């Protein structure tokens, strides 16, 4: 049937409906229209990518830790995989899809390769935009009760600085009483170091404003030993030395107890290789008393830790009334007046490791130049002070912290070609060892000789521990084989350890020097007894397991059902004294033999041969869980 022709009115009506429909679908700009349909993307331009999640473990659903990848595509943490894998399945079965597949390198290989990438330093432009603030750090704090608090975090920040970690270090320490010009001298040294590091000379930079520097330990609530956090590399190329500045603070304060001052001297000895004792006007008795004690403590510390006691010492007399007089002559006059009272200081100053330097007071007019103006005398003082600072900084690389010759016979690590020089990391470890001794509770000391006795006893105690641990390790190695272990009953092993412990206590106890010798021996005996008990617990369990295995095998191979009686009798007769611990072994031997019986009797030779073969393989591979573990 032919379609009727559309009139003009019908055509306009249909066209209006289509336009309204398109407007409803979002092609018009009306505010009430719906959101337009998304357009079809042809993929010709860049597509926004959804953020990819980090790979997670298929078991714990957390970020992978030490990952293991399988051929099936699943990844697991090594701990999750070891916990949920099927025992005895080789190659392993995937805990998720249960497919048997091999391990592949996968994520583990990628992580290992990323660790091998070289750590590139930041470009100079970025380093300048984000500099690390250099400041004085408090290393040793004196609390309100007069005790010492060692801040290992601050020590590690300084000595393990990237410029000092693997580099020999020189520590310039300024000693002296309060108001003796320590901060003044430290600021001049600090201002001269950058120029010497860059090759422009070691004289202080700037004018009056730059001489103020920073405030070293100015806060009375934070007394102790301070160090400048940033090292300066001085010396020739290939032989650079990281130089630090150290302020000993209140180490000479008479308010502190004698024990605290001795400990501060010990820490100062470890934290210095070039000492400057700054005094005002003349050397006083307090200065000489402190210096005598400091030299004595340095000798004790050097003997115990194998370090050079005093590498270089300057006696700097500021505001001296004899600025034109030679320093050694000035010291000679002092010791003529105080002869015999300070033997160690006198011996030190007569050698080549120490010198005396004199500086005039600022503004003091020379006696033979009465017409000189104050500005001229200040210029003279600056000139002499600048010459001294330049001389000290130029000589600093020659006095890096070092050990005594012959100390390296113990087989320690080599540092930068010269085995005697200490790097920053090695010095930080030595300070940590020293803090461990200082932190122990025990009898106090009031003299360097008593401190030397405590360090001597500490060395003897550590030697006794090492000797006993070595003996236990030898017994562990000697009884790893099954038949070797069965020859030594647990009671016999216990007696061997007890005899060795008593011999060590008797031999090392005679050499102890401190008054609290009995308390030291009791503490040492308790530690040795704990080591022996830990070994005996593991040894007894291993012995019982070996005995049960051998008893069951022999009983089954020889007499079938009656072999169980033989196995039980063998275990019971061998360990009558260890009945409680070995009853399980005897029962296993009897039950196993009774059930298996004669069915395996014909395979006795093969069984024993397999046991010995497995034992040899285990010896070659080594025990996965040794009885004695070292941290």
From Swiss-Prot:
Q: Which molecular function GO terms apply here?
A: GTP binding; GTPase activity; ubiquitin protein ligase activity; zinc ion binding
> Which EC main class describes this enzyme?
transferase
Query: Main localization of the protein?
Result: membrane
Q: Show where the GB1/RHD3-type G domain sits.
A: 166-397
Q: What is this protein called?
A: RING finger protein 112
Q: Name the lineage.
A: Eukaryota, Metazoa, Chordata, Craniata, Vertebrata
Where in or outside the cell it occurs: the entry states: Membrane; Cytoplasm; Nucleus; Nucleus, Nuclear body
Q: Name one GO cellular component term.
A: nuclear body
